[in-house]
Amino acid sequence: MKKVLALVVAAAMGLSSAAFAAETTATAAPAASTAAPAKTVHHKKHHKAAKPAAEQKAQAAKKHHKKAAKPAVEQKAQAAKKHHKKAAKHEAAKPAAQPAA
């Protein structure tokens, strides 16, 4: 009952929940004091190997690779670029097939 009252009072005062956890585990700790304390393991941070300094470039030069220059093509009208005309059929040049009489 006292723990509940302490939690309500502490919540009203605006204390963090981490403080509550510390208080509640501190009261249960004497019962578990017979267990061996856990070893603290220090983890080593992995450091990346230093790369040689690259030549500094403009930001656009890094991202955009220029294509090989093509020889200049003769300028055409816009319609001529888009529409390819099919070869015109000349019907008049051929004599009409006459039915066999």
UniProtKB/Swiss-Prot annotation:
Subcellular localization: Periplasm
Signal peptide as annotated in the record: 1-21
Domain of life, per lineage: Bacteria
Gene name per UniProt: asr
GO CC annotation: periplasmic space
InterPro entries in alphabetical order: Acid_shock
Protein name, per record: Acid shock protein
Biased composition (Low complexity): 26-39
Main location, first listed in the record: periplasm
Role, per record: Required for growth and/or survival at acidic conditions.
Organism, scientific name: Enterobacter cloacae
Span list, region Disordered: 26-101
One Pfam family linked to the record: Asr
Prosegment location in residue numbers: 22-59
Family label: Belongs to the Asr family.
Basic residues composition-biased segments: 40-50, 60-69, 79-88
PTM note: Proteolytic processing gives rise to the active protein.
Keyword Signal: yes
Keywords: Periplasm, Signal
